[in-house]
């Protein structure tokens, strides 16, 4: 189509150029043939000669000045007529030329149009095919893109839904946390008020304690001065006591000598008395059975030996016949003793004393004995533990204790660890602890790994007897930090 339009414009330009050349040729008088060349087209025009026109060399011209006015006018009219004829002839020739060109151009235009249409159709078909291919490719790409966009959109929608659910969950959690924070803030405010009140109370108490401390310091100062005076008096009393003890010792020797003399004289007079004195007792049960039913100190004899020992016999408790092997009541005797002292015994049988491990070991290995432990606290309460079978091993086995059959009110569990433990002292460590329990807890005892009991510990007076790990303790009655007021360990034959 564009080629046809271009050809039409080209031919119009050719005709216009031919017309312009024709006008130029008309201006040149004397030329009878005119030729127009435009591209591959060549046009030749033959025009008639102008016979009626005069040349400028006419004799009338040289005399034109001398002619009258009517002659000049007629000449002009004639010339105009000639020109009109010429113009009419030219017009006719141009019309013929135009008709000729139109007739010739129609055929050429038809051929050109047919060729152009064929060429253009092929081009258009090719272009259309390319466009269809491109359109199909673009459509396929658009379909892929659309699918990708759809998948991406779906994924984004799912993510958006997840984010929305997560956001809702977070909002709920935030609301819950906000509620918890508000509760905590309220509780914190309450606690702050309580702390402030406690601080005020604490300040008041500190002031009161400070005042009491000042008062106590004054009292301590006074007591220190009193103690110094008492120490001076004690030193004086000690000196006097030493003198009195010496005097008492001399008196005792004198009394013993007198008693010996009296016994000798009585023996000479009454032979039955000498026979009674030769009778010996193994334990207080034999003393009780012999008719002596009064509490007191009696002389006992080691089994299979003539060696004697002083012991206190309880002839009233539980039917009597009890041999006291340990007693604590006032802290007058120090129980932080050596192995040898615990072996042979120490103290005063009428007060605090330890009978001796060697005698108890030999005695309890002769026959079956029971052990009763009687306890008192500082509040006036009493309790006991009774073991149906008791004996001590020999010194070679560190006087190991053996107990069976516990009854009593001082705890359902034995405060003396079982099986039997070896005896330990400050110079004979036989316990199961690397800490040396006898040195740490004081006193000699059957320690395990320091164990739940120690009746030979440090004696503490009332109001100082709590929270004492090294006191006189029996764990399963009063706990580990309570130091008892009094204890008694006594034995008696099981068949008494």
Swiss-Prot record:
Residues 166-248 form a coiled coil. One of its GO terms (molecular function) is receptor ligand activity. It holds the Pfam family ANG-1. It comes from the Eukaryota. Keywords: Angiogenesis, Calcium, Coiled coil, Developmental protein, Differentiation, Disease variant, Disulfide bond, Glycoprotein, Metal-binding, Secreted, Signal. The keyword Signal applies. InterPro entries: FIB_ANG-like, Fibrinogen-like_C, Fibrinogen_a/b/g_C_1, Fibrinogen_a/b/g_C_dom, Fibrinogen_CS. Ca(2+) binds at residues 429, 431, 433, 435. Residues 275-495 form the Fibrinogen C-terminal domain. Changing residue 299 to M: In LMPHM10; uncertain significance; results in increased lymphangiogenesis; decreased interaction with ITGA5; no effect on protein abundance; no effect on secretion; no effect on interaction with TEK. The Fibrinogen C-terminal domain mediates interaction with the TEK/TIE2 receptor. It is linked to Lymphatic malformation 10: A form of primary lymphedema, a disease characterized by swelling of body parts due to developmental anomalies and functional defects of the lymphatic system. Patients with lymphedema may suffer from recurrent local infections. LMPHM10 is an autosomal dominant form characterized by the onset of swelling in the lower extremities within the first year of life. Lymphedema may also occur in the neck, upper extremities, and scrotum or labia majora. Gradual resorption generally occurs, although some patients may experience progression complicated by cellulitis. Binds to TEK/TIE2, competing for the ANGPT1 binding site, and modulating ANGPT1 signaling. Can induce tyrosine phosphorylation of TEK/TIE2 in the absence of ANGPT1. In the absence of angiogenic inducers, such as VEGF, ANGPT2-mediated loosening of cell-matrix contacts may induce endothelial cell apoptosis with consequent vascular regression. In concert with VEGF, it may facilitate endothelial cell migration and proliferation, thus serving as a permissive angiogenic signal. Involved in the regulation of lymphangiogenesis. This is Angiopoietin-2. It comes from Homo sapiens. The lineage of its organism: Eukaryota, Metazoa, Chordata, Craniata, Vertebrata. The gene is ANGPT2.
